[in-house]
Amino acid sequence: LQAMQDETCLNKVRDKHVTILAKNMAGLKELFELITLSHTKYLSYNSKSTTNVVAEPRIIRSEIEKRRMNGNLLIGSSCVNGEVFDIAQTRSEKELEEVMRFYDYIELQPLGNYQFLIDRNSISDENRLKEILTGIIEKAVALHKPIVASSDAHYVHPNQKLIRDIYINSQAI
């Protein structure tokens, strides 16, 4: 299967969010390298026509792995759109453990950040959500992974929400 991969394979898979933090100046350089690659070599276009082209920066795991070997980057599991939450929701504990080994720390957000999943019926109710989050916590503790409470913030001031909403919704135009 790997031999069948080509430059367009990124367009065919669902992307997952990840958080990458630089520990020092060398890590900052490595982070900038990843950002550059995501906006050039791995830029994903989700339109076949040349009008109204929408592009999304992406980076493949092997590029992250290559740069993290130097010890200058920390890799976090990110938000509800990350791999850990997805696997915890849909797969086995063994698969969750396997996936979590990749991350340096595990991120969790307040329950309210996941409410849209209940509203969309992706998760049946708050009890199921708590089961998923508890499973993530228990597995992180077992693997000695630090658990970080984050807010998945995309803006600082409430009036900036409108700007973000316009940006997010304009990607579909």
Predicted segments with their positions:
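Phosphodiester-processing cores and adjacent nucleic acid-binding clamps
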Residues: 1-173
